[in-house]
Amino acid sequence: MRIRTMLTIAAIGSVTLTGVTVAPSMAADEPGAGPGIVTDVLTPEEEAKVHASVDPADKVDMYYKGEKVDPASDWNGADICVEVSEDGTMQCFDSDTEANKFLAAHAPTAEARSGAKLALAAKPAATQNVTMVAPKDAAIQRYQDCPSSYVCLWQNANYSGRRLQWPTYDTARTRHLDQYSPSFRDKASSAFINRPQRGVELYDFRSGLPDPHLFLGAGYSLYSNFTNIDYTYGGSWNDKADAIKF
């Protein structure tokens, strides 16, 4: 097993994370470096369970402006797709404001609706007392686009590019990233686990080798660049995730 431990913000005054500098306050509910990253391979029993829980051929319905997303259209140009039903149905949006207005009324859990309402009410400059300095775009704190209680995956590093977003349910759910049309398989590059408890697992399905999995801790944890997370068979976890358990 490979275990890569990352410093928590409570332990240090400031920390540099993959080109992103975080100067945190000491509030317990503010985001910071992930508490720990664990990458390993699944046992045959675990692998069978994960594969049985998702079927990539069973496509998720995705909607944008009231119409089903064309699988050939790359989300019809939308930037954000959010799970809005326990059956996996996704709604896609052009902006965070548009998404949060919808989610404040229609998200599948009270916690998710509350998170969207908080995001709408928050002032952009004061959403969190954390200063982020990102390459080429120092003024934007992109991780804040992910509302409270949600799990978010971005297509690019530093919380940029297209984003998939899932609410927190009473029990964990597993989704195959190939269920989305078009697929988000092998595209994830950064993540924010914006909740205090229950981490997230990412899986890479392999042929002829045990499937690697990556555990990302909870606790409002930021993972800005998967290229810096070691992959079991060499290289990094960037553009490797095939499924997510959230």
What are these model-derived regions, one by one?
Residues 17-25:
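C-terminal segment of classical bacterial N-terminal signal peptides
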Residues 2-8, 28-246:
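Compact beta-sheet-dominated domain cores in extracellular/mature segments
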Residues 8-16:
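Hydrophobic helical h-region of N-terminal Sec-dependent signal peptides
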